[in-house]
Regions:
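Short, contiguous pre-domain boundary segments
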Residues: 2-9, 292-296
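N-terminal cofactor/phosphate-binding cores enriched in small/glycine residues
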Residues: 4, 9-70, 79-84
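Short beta-alpha connecting loops at secondary-structure transitions
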Residues: 6-7, 70-77, 184-188, 226, ...
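Short strand-coil-strand connectors
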Residues: 9, 55, 414-416, 490
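Short, structural beta-strand-to-alpha-helix junction motif
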Residues: 19-23, 336, 504
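Fe-S ferredoxin-like electron-transfer domains
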Residues: 48-232, 236-240, 245
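Catalytic alpha/large subunits of respiratory electron-transfer oxidoreductases
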Residues: 93, 97, 150, 156-157, ...
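N-terminal leader/propeptide and maturation segments of large enzyme subunits in energy/redox metabolism
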Residues: 98-137, 497-561
Length: 602
């Protein structure tokens, strides 16, 4: 790798040849503000706040568009740089409304932070601000099915324009009009229609583009915990951060407040799709199963775990004794390695060597409407662990839709013909992720299927038809491992506690195995993973299971550090220490408005 050495503010730094001055500064912890630059999209150089002084160059240069050269001497804090930068900030704030108290970006807004650190102390402008669609939150207009737009806040950094052009490859956003009337817009105000639209909120450095899902929901300082995990909504396995809101147990509403992308150049870069970002409300929704249910007659009744486990083991054991070939397992590819492995062991102990043949792994397959040139592709497979099932010998052959359809079709024919006396369904994903299973419900109604056990998270029509319902964990409530579409081994983190009496799925299976006489001795999921590595020592991709790191929910060190989550690599070091308050004003010496009561000084 070729490198160049340059000096920035008296520090010698060595960087890869071809990097810009701004990238060199950021990589070495030197604070340089910027708005229009984003590491995941093309360089524009339009905001001008990253200007620096470079020796032997007659004028100040934009550091985001200036390539590093050997021996270059750069200054970021000379007096002329400070004054020019403050002037740029003053112009950026000329028409920017003081909406911080009602703006969703407040508290994690680069415009707030950089203006405080680098901008002027006061404005010299006294004329009315330019307004496009009204003022305050009344200026918010529809910007598509997932977004809201406030043009008054826009600083025309063009990040959104370049994202749609460079990443989505569908230039739905453009700058229209000229001069003071310039604004971002879509064709005939149709708004943005894209599977990647939520990323526009991440790239927007101000509160111009916000999402309907997070709008007015919470403030960054009310989200004190964040867990780095992965998304399991499809086979891509995007690295994401789950944000948890501070909420007492008795308060209504969700603890899980939003998902944002986490940078990983090998998986999802800086982005995530709208499915993973917005379709998470089922996790804490009203349809969550929070207690074991046992059907008595035609009515499902809450039961203890002891009674439910004993009932399942008794009925499964009886079915295995009378007709071992009549026991089948239908597992969603949302199941983790640990869960798939335990099911495989369970069937081997119950049914012998032919046991794994009783397992059918299924998932939903749906094509996503995206331009062919899109850089960020969303897979058609709506499950995170099809590859993992194949490695464990439960989904032979290539993980394609044809194989899945053939396996499910064979199981369906057996169920409808009455050859299946007991069916155990494991569905830890969102509703529909296991595919179309209405045929199971129909088989129950017709009497073709005798025993149905459902282990899952949602009270679906399938769960309502079951004799036993065992409440499990969603992907943000357990530490579990998955292999994505490229063969990369990753893990989810436990971000929030389990609801009600729900349990982690490996615990349910270990307890069920014990009730059936299966010699499970696992005390933790770590022990399950170690056993997988031991029994599949020839499968190279699974050998990392014992060293896989699972992240714990971390306290947000500061909401400034979490600002603009898609760029957290920058904020983590840029705001180690907050700058001192400007000015030397004694708040107790300020005159009080008529009728105001002074605060008691302690």
């Amino acid at each position: 790798m070729e490198t160049v050495t340059l000096t920035i503010d008296g520090r010698q730094v060595t960087v890869e040849k071809g990097k810009t001055v701004l990238q060199a500064a950021v990589d070495n912890g030197i604070s340089v503000p910027y708005y229009c630059y984003h590491p995941g999209i093309s360089i524009d150089g339009s905001c001008r706040v990253c200007i620096v002084k470079i020796e032997k160059m007659p004028k100040l240069q934009t550091s985001c568009s200036t390539t590093c050269a050997e021996g270059m001497v750069v200054s970021t804090r000379t007096q002329d740089v400070i004054e020019a930068r403050a002037g740029v900030f003053e112009f950026l704030l000329v028409n920017h409304p003081l909406d911080c108290p009602v703006c969703d970006k407040g508290g994690e807004c680069p415009l707030q932070d950089f203006s405080y650190q680098f901008g002027p102390e006061q404005s010299r402008m006294e004329f009315p601000r330019r307004e496009f669609d009204g003022n305050g939150v009344r200026a918010d207009v529809d910007f598509g099915p997932t977004l809201m737009l406030n043009r008054n806040r826009c600083i025309l950094c063009t990040r959104c324009v370049r994202f749609m052009r460079d990443i989505d490859h569908d230039a739905q956003i453009n700058i229209i009009d000229r001069g003071n009337g310039s604004q971002i817009a879509t064709f005939q105000e149709e708004g943005v229609h894209s599977l990647l639209s939520g990323n526009l909120m991440d790239v927007c450095p101000v509160g111009a583009i916000t999402t309907r899902d997070y709008r007015f929901k919470s403030r960054p300082w009310d989200n004190p915990f964040a867990a780095d995990t992965i998304c399991t909504q499809c086979a891509k396995g995007c690295n994401v951060t789950a944000w948890i809101k501070a909420k007492p147990e008795w308060a209504k509403g969700s603890r899980l407040i939003r998902f944002t992308p986490r940078f990983n150049p090998d998986v999802n870069d800086y982005w995530m799709c709208d499915i993973g970002r917005f379709e998470y409300h089922w996790i804490e929704g009203e349809d969550r199963i929070v207690k074991p249910l046992v059907k008595t007659g035609d009515v499902q009744q809450p039961a203890s775990w002891r009674d439910a486990t004993a009932g399942v083991s008794e009925r499964l054991g009886a079915a295995g004794t009378s007709n071992p070939d009549g026991i089948r397992f239908l597992l969603s590819a949302h199941a983790s390695h640990e869960e798939l492995f335990l099911f495989k062991r369970l069937t081997q102990e119950l049914l012998g060597d032919s046991g794994p043949g009783a397992i059918t792994v299924t998932w939903r397959h749906r094509e996503k409407p995206q331009p062919a040139e899109t850089t960020f592709k969303v897979p058609a497979v709506d499950a995170p662990n099809v590859n993992g099932a194949r490695m464990l010998g439960l989904a032979p052959g290539a993980p394609g839709a044809e194989q899945r359809e053939a396996d499910v079709s064979a199981l369906r024919q057996a169920v409808e013909a009455g050859r299946v006396t007991a069916l155990y369904v494991f569905d830890p994903g969102p509703e529909g992720s296991i595919g179309d299973v209405r045929w199971i419900v129909d088989a129950r109604k017709s009497g073709a299927l005798g025993l149905l056990v459902v282990q899952g998270v949602l009270m679906t029509d399938l769960a309502r038809a079951a004799d036993f319902v065992l409440p499990g964990a969603s992907y943000v409530e357990k530490e579990a491992s998955y292999t994505n579409q490229t063969g990369r081994l990753q893990g989810t983190s436990r971000a929030i506690p389990l609801p009600g009496e729900a349990r982690e799925d490996w615990q349910i299976l270990v307890n069920l195995g014990a009730a059936l006489g299966v010699p499970f001795t696992y005390q933790s999921a770590d022990e399950v993973r170690a056993d997988i590595v031991g029994q599949f020592s020839t499968v190279t991709e699974l050998q990392g299971l014992t060293t896989l790191a699972f992240n714990k929910p971390l306290e947000a060190r500061s909401w400034l550090q979490a600002s603009n989550p898609s760029e957290r690599w920058k904020w983590d070091f840029m705001y180690q220490d907050l700058p001192p308050v400007k000015g030397n004003v004694d708040p107790t010496a300020l005159p009080l408005p008529p009728g105001a009561i002074p605060l008691k000084q302690v």
